[in-house]
Amino acid sequence: YNKLKTRTFINNMSRIGNTATDRFTFKPRMNTEIRGTTHLKCFQEHKEKLFKCMVSLKYKKITNAAVLASIRMRIGSVNQFRPAYAKFIYKKYNSKKVLDISAGWGGRMLGAMACGIDYTGFDTNLNLVEPYKQILAAYPHEGTCKLVSVDSSTVDYSTYDYDTVFTSPPYFMLEKYEHMPTY
């Protein structure tokens, strides 16, 4: 987070900040279902195939990164929005008050925190309420961050003050979020 906050120029494809959100939202992401399974179930049910994949990918050691790479090759990945890209967008458009109708894994919020700007995010995934609180508590920031656990399609946006709307809609057709309705 400190690198994300202090660097004045960050390549918009940078992964800086990803581990800051992973620290709190990695587990719910790994419990998100894609292609009929989760990363955890894939590991439990296909260890032998995953190890063969690691060998074919020429990993010399079995590490968390090697296991994740093998799982992603098998079923795909549940990606987070890069906080560095969010920061890039906020800086480019001189954002001061961001509205995010689908807060997701916290990447856009972390980008706003690193910029010291206000952020209001909506998300119905109740499994993320505690991780959001943990992110806010873990990283010092100047702007106000507000997270609201409601369906953003029911919100009266005229009651909010914002100069930027920036979001990444959920991938309901590809991902099934834990304890969430299927659309």
Predicted feature locations:
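Long, acidic/serine-threonine-rich intrinsically disordered regions with weak helical/coil propensity
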Residues: 1-33
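Class I S-adenosyl-L-methionine-dependent methyltransferase catalytic core
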Residues: 1-4, 29-183
